[in-house]
C-alpha cells in the first residue's frame, strides 16, 4: 500500500501547496485507488502523477469545508473521460455530500457516464469492501467532520507442514485449499484449516483524519495504526489558539501518537502562514527533542509506502 499527497495546505492554496487531497493505493490487496478529500485543483495535481482517475473506485470526504470538497465536481466530470467510463464509484461523506454533487452537476449541465453510490454518514459508519474494513467516527470541528480507520485484509497464517504430514497429507495442491478455505477433507474426514495454520496477521491499519480539535474518538480511529495522517494547522505558537478554531496543534498530535501507539505519523493541513523554510526550521527544532515521536511534515506529491 502507498499513500500520496496531492494537497497539504489548510484553508487556502499557496504557491507551493494545494488544498487537501490524499490518495491511498491499495496494492497488493486490490488494484483500486481511494481518494480522501478533493480540494480545489486536485484533478490538475493528479495529472502530474501516474495515478489515473479510472482506477479511483472510492472517494471519502471528511467534512464539507471548501478546502476539502471544491475540487470534487470537476474531478467527477473528468473521470468520465479519463478511464472511468461505466466504472461505478462509491462516494462516502457527511450528510449533504450527495446534494452538493448533484446540484453542481445539474447547474453546470454536466453528465456522468458512470453510476455513483452515495453513503452519507450520520454518527459513525462501518463499511466493508474487497476484504477492507473502513470505520468512520465523528470528530470535533464545529461542523460534522470524520476520521477514517482503514484496515487492510488479514494475511493467512503459514501452513504447518509437519501437522499436515502427521495426518498423512503430503505437500501438494491440497495445501492451497488448507490455506484458503475454512475446512478441508482428507481420507473422508473433515478438518478445520485453522488447526493447521499459524495465526493470521492483521494487514496495515491507516488512520486518516479530517479537521479536528482533540477528542476521544481520535484514539479509537488511530489505535495501533501503522500510519496516521493528521492535521496540524498550527505547528508553533500557543496551543489554545488552534483549539479555539477547532483545529489541532502539533503538541496535540504528538500526545495522540503516544496515547494511541501510532507507528508513523504524516502531518498535513499546515496553515498557509508557513512557507517551506518555516516548516523546515520548525521540524529541525522539534526533532532535537528526544521525546518527539516519529513524524513527517508532508508536502504535495510526497508518497509513503505502508
From Swiss-Prot:
Residues bound to Zn(2+) 2: 67-68, 211, 269
MF-aspect GO terms: 3'-tRNA processing endoribonuclease activity; zinc ion binding
Binding residues for Zn(2+) 1: 63, 65, 141, 211
Catalytic activity: Endonucleolytic cleavage of RNA, removing extra 3' nucleotides from tRNA precursor, generating 3' termini of tRNAs. A 3'-hydroxy group is left at the tRNA terminus and a 5'-phosphoryl group is left at the trailer molecule
Entry keyword set: Endonuclease, Hydrolase, Metal-binding, Nuclease, tRNA processing, Zinc
Transmembrane residue ranges: none
Comment on bound cofactor: Binds 2 Zn(2+) ions.
Cofactor(s) needed by this chain: Zn(2+)
UniProt keyword Nuclease, yes or no: yes
Domain of life: Bacteria
InterPro entries: RibonucZ/Hydroxyglut_hydro (IPR036866), RNase_Z/BN (IPR013471), tRNase_Z_dom (IPR027794)
Family matches, as PANTHER family: ZINC PHOSPHODIESTERASE ELAC PROTEIN 1
Quaternary structure annotation from Swiss-Prot or TrEMBL: Homodimer.
HAMAP family the record matches: RNase_Z_BN
Family: Belongs to the RNase Z family.
Function: Zinc phosphodiesterase, which displays some tRNA 3'-processing endonuclease activity. Probably involved in tRNA maturation, by removing a 3'-trailer from precursor tRNA.
Protein name: Ribonuclease Z
Lineage summary: Bacteria, Bacillati, Bacillota, Bacilli, Bacillales
Gene (UniProt): rnz
